[in-house]
Regions:
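Structured C-terminal helix/loop/strand segments within mature extracytoplasmic catalytic/sensor domains
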Residues: 2-10, 22-44, 158, 219, ...
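Short, highly charged low-complexity linear segments
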Residues: 144-153, 174-179, 194-211, 292-304, ...
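Active-site-adjacent loops and short helices of periplasmic peptidoglycan-processing enzymes
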Residues: 26-189
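Active-site-proximal helix/loop microenvironment
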Residues: 172-248
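A short small-residue
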Residues: 67, 122-125, 216-218, 314-316
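Sec-dependent N-terminal signal peptides
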Residues: 11-15
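Short alpha-helix boundary/capping motifs
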Residues: 119, 167-168, 179-180, 193-194, ...
Length: 342
């Protein structure tokens, strides 16, 4: 693993010591205009009302100056597939350290398959062998759950990933479970079994769980501190990624390039940005169930046409809006951010 850079930590820390919804002075001199923090706060608070009884969390940071905005910045939100971003970073960190080769071959057995979304599970047993590089691409670009679980195991499991984050002074993110554990638990289901790799079979098994059991499991999931991140924690991660504090230049470039190629979550942050903006992101969401959207998120780095770059993190948990509603709120957060940037 890469060694810790305490000087970088001391330089970054002041930019992250801010209260939710409070203005903050830029960390360094900047040629970019200040964020309209008051206007942004007004817009985000209005969207938080729309999201009720769900909770909205927002983080925005000017990556040149460090000027930041947070709403519910310390609140823990379930990540869903957003966790695949720090997972990919940790895998690339192992590649940088020479502990894993991107060309290393992995042969999948049935017990490694994970619930949807997983084109790799759907392709099994027709295809069983992948390189680490191919699995990494499947995780970041296509959000493949089987690929995520296999790579998680390869680096030592969820505990090892959280330890890697902690070693980088990133304590606002924690990963605790494999997808094959987490996803069934959300719905009060038994442990995942290979026969559920078919989406229809998985949905049928989920519907067999009593409604009261599913509702209780969903409520417990939204209150569970495991597998969560705070908006502040995610901004810290994105800032360190942008500053090359986590990975080599080559690995950082590769990760951002893969994040830029995902087509998932296109109705969220991407929908709220100008057409000429570039976005490298990792969305994540749980299925709308029991009348609630337990997790609907999108985090990333966007670069405007004038080359100003910003980190943004939007989390939404517990909204009772229909399937399109949470997407629309995240897109509106992105629009509000662009207006505030000026």
């Amino acid at each position: 693993m890469a060694t810790l850079d305490r000087r970088a930590l001391l330089a970054v820390a002041p930019a992250l010591l801010l209260a939710a919804c409070e203005p903050k002075m830029p960390q360094t001199a900047s040629t970019t205009p200040k964020i309209d923090l008051e206007g942004l706060d007004t817009a985000i608070k209005a969207l938080a009302v729309v999201a009720q009884p769900g909770f909205l969390g927002v983080g925005l940071m000017n990556l040149e100056s460090g000027e930041s905005y947070l709403f519910n910045g310390e609140r823990r939100f379930p990540m869903q597939s957003v966790f695949k971003l720090p997972l990919a970073a940790a895998v690339l960190g192992e590649i940088d350290a020479g502990k894993i080769l991107s060309s290393e071959r992995v042969f999948l057995i049935e017990q490694q398959l994970a619930p949807q979304h997983s084109p790799i599970a759907a392709a099994w047993p027709g295809r069983r062998e992948y390189s680490v590089g191919e699995l990494l691409e499947a995780v970041v670009v296509d959000s493949d759950n089987t690929a995520a679980d296999v790579l998680m195991k390869r680096i030592g499991g969820p505990g090892a990933l959280t330890a890697w984050l902690t070693a980088k002074y990133l304590t606002g993110i924690r990963v605790d479970r494999y997808e094959r554990e987490l996803q069934p638990q959300i719905h009060g289901m038994a442990s995942f079994r290979p026969g559920w790799r078919d989406p229809a079979a998985y949905a049928a098994a989920r519907e067999k769980v009593p409604a009261a059991t599913r509702a209780a499991a969903m409520t417990a999931y939204m209150a569970d501190p495991r597998d969560t991140a705070s908006p502040r924690g995610m901004l810290e991660f994105l800032q360190k990624l942008d500053r090359r504090d986590l990975l080599s230049v080559t690995s950082t470039r590769l990760l951002l390039e893969m994040m830029g190629r995902t087509t998932r979550g296109a109705a969220r942050l991407q929908a709220g940005l100008p057409s000429d903006a570039r976005l490298a992101h990792r969305p994540g969401a749980a299925d709308f169930a029991q009348g609630r959207s337990p997790a609907h998120n999108d985090v990333g780095i966007f670069t405007l046409a004038n080359r100003r770059a910003y980190a943004i993190a939007v989390f939404l948990s517990g909204a009772t809006l229909d399937d399109a509603g949470p997407d629309a709120i995240i897109a509106r957060v992105a629009r509000a951010a662009v207006r505030a940037i000026g």
